[in-house]
């Protein structure tokens, strides 16, 4: 098993949440591959694309996951309540909420999720 430090972003139109967790894999996922993360409350319906993998000497590999996408150019955004629910559900899976700040990055390339 390969222990990896995984970074996950979840976004709404106004906020961007950054979560972190040590996750074990049978083999280290590579850039461009897709991951489904355990989420017992909300389900593991979403596949997150591995955006980058960084290897540090003397440390765990670090893996940055891409924000959910609806297409190659648009990002999926949660509504505000749904974002709070997903953050809470990942915290219940032992993810650490490192920050939640204003979303200035994905506003212009976003698609609001429709349920």
Where are these regions (language model features)?
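Short, well-ordered loop/turn sites that connect or cap secondary structure elements
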Residues: 28-30
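Short beta-strand-centered aromatic/proline hotspots
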Residues: 44-55
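Glycine- and charge-enriched low-complexity intrinsically disordered segments
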Residues: 60-115
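Short alpha-helix capping/helix-loop boundary micro-motifs
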Residues: 18-25
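Short, basic/aromatic beta-hairpin or loop at an interaction surface
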Residues: 1-17
């Amino acid at each position: 098993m390969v222990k990896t430090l995984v970074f996950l972003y979840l976004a709404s139109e106004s906020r961007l949440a950054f979560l972190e967790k040590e996750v074990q894999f049978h083999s280290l996922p590579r850039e461009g591959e897709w991951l489904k993360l355990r989420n017992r409350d909300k389900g593991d319906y979403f596949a997150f694309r591995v955006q980058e993998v960084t290897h540090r000497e003397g440390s765990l590999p670090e893996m940055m996951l891409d924000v959910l996408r609806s297409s190659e150019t648009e990002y999926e955004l949660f509504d505000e309540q749904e974002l709070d629910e997903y953050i809470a559900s990942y915290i219940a899976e032992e993810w650490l909420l490192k920050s939640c700040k204003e979303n200035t990055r994905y506003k212009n390339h976003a698609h609001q999720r429709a349920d």
